[in-house]
Amino acid sequence: MADGAGMAGVPLDVSGRKPGAAGGIHAVDSDAAVVVDAVHAAQGVRVVDSSGLNHILPVEAGQTLAQTIWLSGELSPPALCSGLGRCGACRVRFLEGTPEPCDADSAILGAEAVRGGWRLACRHAAVAGMVVELPPPPSEKRKRMDIRPDAGPFRLAVDLGTTSIHWHLLDGTGHEAASGQALNPQMGAGSEVVSRLAAARNQEGRERLGHLVIRFLQRVVSDVGVPVAELCIAGNTAMTSILLNEDVAGLCAAPYRLTEPGGRTAELPGLPPAWIPPQPAPFVGGDISAGMAALLYGEPPEFPFLLADMGTNGEFVLALDKERSFIASVPLGPSLEGIGLRYGGVADTGSVSGFRLGPFGLSPVVIGNTEPKRICGTGYLSLLDALLRTGFLDATGRLASASVSPLAARLLGTVERGAAGWSLPLPGGMELAGADVEEILKVKAAFSLALESLLAASGLESRALARVCLGGALGEHMPETALERLGFLPQGLQARTVAEGNTSLRGAALLLTRPELRERLVRWSSGCTLVDLAARPDFTALYMRHMVFG
């Protein structure tokens, strides 16, 4: 979809004149805002970004203010909770056209912020004439080495995640020349796979979302400053289908079917040729097949092993040997990436990656040794593990009816209760909400059910696994013992569990530097046996049985 189509607005220069046939939404500085054409401003929403630039965004019927702002492609989205009104990341301050506050505004933002004009953009419809101000956007991380133009050919490995996009620029020897990561620009459509699929069911929505990622990749290719010969883009089936503008109807309702098998080179507008890893099943995609390439064709673990790619969609491979594998997938939601939780966020400087128990309570372990700003997924796992050990929580995730330790009694005494449920104050002005515990418990139930089902299908017991390899959200900052105590892993398996980092990105890089492996990976994919959990008539009963910690 070209700039200026669909979500694009009327471009304005600083004098308010239309600049000919130029496409896209134009920004003007705050000093020039007074001369922005009032007619155009009245037809859309005026957004003032953190640098003072004004963006005039068109309003589409039925859209929330969050969708209007962050599906425009003009502003970097925060990590949103799919419009549930829980995370507070979509907060904006109204300068004109302030709507009446809703219950979620008051509960999440607080009375003082609401009086100051702050609202949750996901809870209010976009109305022409509104003027809002945004807080600073999330930063994009980049690492640039000394890129020598004569060191090519250069290739770009991409891990296209639902939440984040990670990339590595490889030189002609296969070494990393630059790298970066950013939130997926499709976040305006929601943080979960199901939200993206809903937005992509029609052609216009699919093109809109695909265009956001294509524009991001075009910018990366342009910014590295050297010719890029080829890409390898590894993503889950939903992200890949949207990127390739393939019909997603088969992923939206049972019986699920896959229209894009991958294992081919795709041509994308304004980009070098992109190889798409094979997608073995409707919700087992190129991200985990690339991860398997990294393990199988690098230094493979002893068989049998399990690879769990813990993203918004959980994908699992139980490899019996180099040719035979059982695969499964379960929707996990973005909780393990810290998204959708009250103080959640991606793992970055200022994120709490763990909690320690001491005689005086909980102390956070912060990435970068700075003041805590948010809690990443592993931080939440560590926190719940600590609260279970003290007796503050019971196995169902509820507050304990009777304290079993002095520390639990002290913590229970600090609990605050309100219309939205209970919350526990934490260091750094943060808090844990009862709803956060429930979200993590859902992830635990899905994870342990998938593992149990794969073991049953393969005829193995957990003690037969030589290794459990964790990728995705748990690949970098794995809680050392929490997974077993929380019940994600059977007893005795934690000692054989390894955080493998970003296996998807590592595999994409390998498939660029050793293209002869691509056909082998396609053969591996075609030989996988799917364990279809969603098709089981007893799925709900089994899932509920796993809705306990430990």
Which residues does each predicted region cover?
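Acidic, glycine/GT-rich loop-and beta-edge segments that sit at the periphery of enzyme/chaperone cores
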Residues: 39-46, 118, 277-289, 510-550
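N-terminal phosphate-binding loop and adjacent alpha-helix
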Residues: 185-224, 340-343, 351-356, 439-442, ...
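Fe-S ferredoxin-like electron-transfer domains
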Residues: 33-36, 40, 45, 59, ...
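Local cysteine-cluster metal-coordination motifs and their immediate loop/turn environment
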Residues: 76-98, 114-127
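Glycine-rich phosphate-binding loop of actin/hexokinase-like ATP-binding domains
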Residues: 167, 174-192, 250-265, 290, ...
